[in-house]
């Protein structure tokens, strides 16, 4: 929009919040989507608020809130504080300085979509607003407009079929197993082997092990029989070392076999297949040959090759199965938002404050698909 600052793009994740100005390749700010309040304050005292990494570091002294859980906003007041923090402390901008594009999960409840628009227009005072599905933006970032996006972050894993930029909601599948669950599972596996990393502060260490040492086995049963000489030595922050082996492929296996974390649901291979089979017959081959990975929990080495193998077993004979694993998939949702909000052809898509005032919050259902 002319006369304004470049649009702000906010990717609202269960684990991390990513924010920055459209037109840049990476978000300028990425930090945990958590809010901390000082304990023991009274109604008359000024309450100390910490967000992101600062809240993580001081969490033993704070009451911690997670504004987004399982992909959905669970505390609207805290979410608004996080959004205001982005403008006031990260970007040093007034919300009225320019448009904002906010991401949302597939199947976001209608009431939540309306509420988000109300907060940005009525409370923050943005001049223009748009909301876009995370999977659609990840697909755009990969250079496609049609494909099946497997998006897995901290809170949820979703399979989303997209045709020419439009989410086919009848084919969306969701699994409530994602990064946070895998971290908890790895803590349990380590405990079973006598490696006690169970304190709240240890979670960061276990997350680091998960992100830098875990991998997906091509064949889970075969991997179980391999020699322990495949052990990895991991150095803990206190200088002690631990030997890791089977935990490293046990952990991400829960994405393929959710029963490992006590969730009765199909794994990601069956999710992808089921999602595709919900779609029109003429579109299925396009989806089988364009499965796009997105989100940090799809970054395990070997996940893409294992997914090809397992989906191919389920697919009709002679079906070409291709999985595309963009190297930047941890931030691809935000990147897609940055690209979209910068396109000259997109500028007529913004919902303006005047339009919102005239039509009301229902306008998001008419304009944001």
Swiss-Prot record:
PANTHER family: ACTIN
Gene coding for it: Actrt3
Tissue: Testis specific (at protein level). Expressed specifically in haploid germ cells.
Annotated GO CC locations: cytoplasm; cytoskeleton; male germ cell nucleus
Pfam families xref list: Actin
Family of the protein in this entry: Belongs to the actin family.
Keyword Cytoplasm tagged: yes
Assembly: Interacts with PFN3.
Family annotation (InterPro entries): Actin, ATPase_NBD
Subcellular location: Cytoplasm, Cytoskeleton; Cytoplasm; Nucleus
Protein name: Actin-related protein T3
Signal peptide bounds: none
Cysteine disulfide links: none
SUPFAM superfamilies registered for this protein in UniProt: Actin-like ATPase domain
Keywords noted in UniProt: Cytoplasm, Cytoskeleton, Nucleus
CDD domains registered for this protein in UniProt: ASKHA_NBD_actin_Arp-T1-3
Keyword Nucleus: yes
Domain of life: Eukaryota
